[in-house]
Amino acid sequence: TSTTLVKCACEPCLCNVDPSKAIDRNGLYYCCEACADGHTGGSKGCGHTGCNC
């Protein structure tokens, strides 16, 4: 079984996510809450290796 990955909708994020496991906000897929919330409150990064969004 192959899974189709999509890029996280957070523009600077480098992560690819499985839509069935991603955070869905208004039809856009995000890798984590920080990205889905637009990094409000000064949150930086998603915590995934190699990504500095």
Curated annotation (Swiss-Prot):
Give GO terms: molecular function aspect only: metal ion binding
Which Pfam families does the record cross-reference, listed alphabetically?
Metallothio_Pro
Q: Does the keyword Metal-binding apply?
A: yes
Disulfide-bond pairs as recorded = none
Q: What does this protein do?
A: This protein complexes cadmium, zinc and copper.
Q: Which organism is it from?
A: Synechococcus sp
* Keywords carried by this UniProt record: Cadmium, Copper, Metal-binding, Metal-thiolate cluster, Zinc
The protein's matches in SUPFAM superfamilies, at most eight in alphabetical order, are given as: Metallothionein (SSF57868)
Annotated family = Belongs to the metallothionein superfamily. Type 14 family.
Name used for this protein in its record? Metallothionein
